[in-house]
Amino acid sequence: MRAPNYARPLLLSILLGATGLTPAHAQGRPFLEWAGELSLVRSGGGDTTWQISRVAGGVQEDGRYGWTLAGEHHRRGDLGDWVGQANAFRRAGVWIVSGGVGLAADPEFIYRQSLEGELARIVGRGFVVHGGYRYLRYRDATVHMIQPAVSWYLRGHEVQARGFVVRNATTDEQSGTVLLRANLEASPRVRLAAGTALGTRIFDATAIRNTNAEAWVVFGFARIVVTPHFTVVAGAGGAHEEPMFDQRTLSLGARWTF
């Protein structure tokens, strides 16, 4: 029996952003990284665990360009899915273009195909405006996501507000979420990050119809540069979505830069 759940990962994508710097601040040379996530989940009155493991490698060159190839294994209870991903970005003057693709073979709960792209422009005084789109094709649904955002960079710190306008084309359901996050350079070796998201159907774009499915997410991370080549990230977070979903998550990641 296939899982009727299209939930998105809570923390892993944010963990990866904390492991390496954002494209506008990427530091050069090839890298390898690993990330893992363990969640205690209560859904529909039952308790289960979700796990994500990720290995990746790529290149980032001084904020000018970069690419990443990754493999992920997602497990929810007794069900497991594998997914392959490729992402890249390129900066040209004040413009930054990025995109990615994800593919899974005969998945139980994760998407079959994912396509995304974003165009960002540096507008001055540390501000960057973004416009993004993501297409997600599941076994039983097609989801479109529009993602406007604005970021502010100041002396190594960053604040971002990002919106998610989500439409399930299969059921014609729509939802929206706002994500606020910030990271700061506490010291040359330590970067701290935290954020929150508020909205509806954050975890399931095909949530129970005729319900508000109001949801929230909170998270925090610490990124520590152990050596010039080795970085670790530890994080924690929690989430709730009406009427009956709760999640508590711990994450750990590491990156080796050559």
Describe the predicted segments one by one:
Residues 24-81, 85, 89-94, 202, ...:
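Outer-membrane beta-barrel initiation region
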Residues 30-32, 61-69, 94-99, 125-131, ...:
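Repeated loop/turn-to-beta-strand initiation elements of outer-membrane beta-barrel proteins
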Residues 32-40, 69-73, 86, 99-103, ...:
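Transmembrane beta-barrel strands of outer-membrane/channel proteins
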Residues 49-53, 80-84, 93, 111-115, ...:
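Residues that define the transmembrane beta-barrel architecture of outer-membrane proteins
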Residues 59-61, 90, 121, 152, ...:
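Residue-level signature of outer-membrane beta-barrel architecture
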Residues 96, 105-107, 181-183, 189-231:
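Outer membrane beta-barrel transmembrane domains
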Residues 121-202:
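Detector for outer-membrane/organellar transmembrane beta-barrel domains
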Residues 155, 180, 247-258:
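Outer-membrane beta-barrel "beta-signal"
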